[in-house]
């Protein structure tokens, strides 16, 4: 088995992560006249697809829907794009910078490994941000903490992450040690799709290489003076580990703004929303209002002030971006209507003359 999935060898649909959810979307005609493929790499020039018939390149075309690594697509007999199958899960973020757009990260993921190093990169608020994205996508999150040997506060930091949620899986590993990384094996069984997400240089590619048992992704060290990664993954790709799971290694993300993520934020900060139900006033802003159950929890030490402030921040961010996306979609809809009217008027003029 070629772990990097770069050869032209065929894979069974089960190996590629095929599930009943996708099978239910196919007709008899689809089975007879199309090839079922999964996108295993996404580059500027196009997509790399794997199927039971082998490996294919699919050029990006403006008429295609937006697609990314993890998507299932159907190709016709000429190996041309025919249809994108409905996604079981979808990881996305607001595109970096001021651009008003939602960027796909990966799709059809079963487990999201949220990777954070226990050196200067350690940041609980960033972990909560990733958890919100995972929960919005209905993907099981697992927090993977690396570089424990670089921090004298490693044990304290691990406990802090575990306290974010009683049901949250947290694993501290040495990314270079196969025995240590084997703690992730329960989520890496045959046919499952997992993805790594985290800042640049936290060890995502190193973890991938250790699971694969080979140097597949280019990696670089972290400078001790500023803890910044020097070499990072630049394109999304899928790899198959010996145990049979598919791993999506995403580029490091210097900026990760939430898109429409209200459900994810609510689930990540569930205890705050539960406390809010006990406030004296229904419109309580959890600031200085009398009878605020949230502020009372902060005062008695059962809720961290940092966590409340991050909840406020993520709520504002996702609400703003969601409304911005909605406005953009409405403008595009109106523009589409105008174009159709113009085409209709032109057709009428041709008919008249």
Curated annotation (Swiss-Prot):
GO cellular component assignments: cytoplasm
Molecular function as annotated in GO: GTP binding; GTPase activity; metal ion binding; rRNA binding
Pfam families, A to Z: RsgA_GTPase
Entry binding sites for GTP: 146-149, 198-206
Family matches, as InterPro entries: G_CP_dom, P-loop_NTPase, Ribosome_biogen_GTPase_RsgA, RsgA_GTPase_dom
Binding site for Zn(2+): 279, 284, 286, 292
Entry cofactors: Zn(2+)
Location(s) in or outside the cell: Cytoplasm
Note on cofactor: Binds 1 zinc ion per subunit.
Family assignment from sequence similarity: Belongs to the TRAFAC class YlqF/YawG GTPase family. RsgA subfamily.
Record-linked HAMAP family: GTPase_RsgA
Protein name as annotated: Small ribosomal subunit biogenesis GTPase RsgA 2
């Amino acid at each position: 088995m070629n772990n990097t999935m770069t050869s032209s060898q065929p894979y069974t649909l089960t190996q590629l992560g095929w599930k009943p959810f996708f099978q239910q979307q196919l007709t008899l005609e689809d089975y007879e006249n199309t090839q079922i493929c999964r996108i295993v790499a996404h580059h500027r020039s196009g997509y790399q697809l794997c199927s039971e018939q082998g490996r294919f390149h699919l050029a990006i075309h403006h008429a295609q829907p937006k697609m990314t690594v993890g998507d299932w697509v159907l190709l016709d007999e000429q190996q041309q794009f025919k249809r994108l199958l409905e996604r079981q899960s979808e990881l996305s973020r607001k595109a970096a910078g001021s651009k008003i757009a939602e960027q796909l990260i990966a799709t059809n993921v079963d487990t999201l490994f949220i990777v954070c190093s226990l050196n200067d990169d350690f940041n609980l608020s960033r972990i909560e941000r990733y958890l919100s994205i995972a929960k919005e996508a209905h993907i099981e999150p697992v927090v993977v903490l690396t570089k424990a040997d670089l921090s004298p506060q490693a044990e304290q930091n691990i406990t802090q992450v575990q306290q974010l949620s009683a049901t949250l899986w947290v694993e501290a590993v040495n990314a270079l040690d196969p025995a240590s990384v084997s703690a992730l094996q329960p989520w890496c069984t045959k046919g499952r799709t997992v993805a790594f997400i985290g800042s640049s240089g936290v060890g995502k590619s190193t973890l991938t290489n250790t699971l694969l048992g080979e140097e597949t992704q280019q990696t670089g060290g972290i400078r001790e003076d500023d803890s910044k990664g020097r070499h990072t993954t630049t394109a999304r790709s899928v790899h198959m580990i010996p145990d049979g799971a598919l791993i999506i290694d995403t580029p490091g993300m210097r900026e990760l703004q939430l898109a429409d993520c209200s459900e994810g934020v609510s689930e990540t900060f569930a205890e705050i929303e539960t406390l809010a139900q006990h406030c004296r006033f229904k419109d309580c802003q959890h600031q200085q209002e009398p009878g605020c159950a949230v502020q009372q929890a902060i005062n008695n030490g059962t809720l961290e002030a940092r966590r409340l402030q991050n909840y406020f921040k993520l709520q504002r961010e996702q609400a703003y971006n969601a409304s911005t996306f909605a406005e953009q979609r409405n403008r595009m809809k109106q523009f589409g209507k105008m174009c159709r009217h113009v085409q209709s008027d032109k057709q009428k003029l041709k008919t008249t003359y």
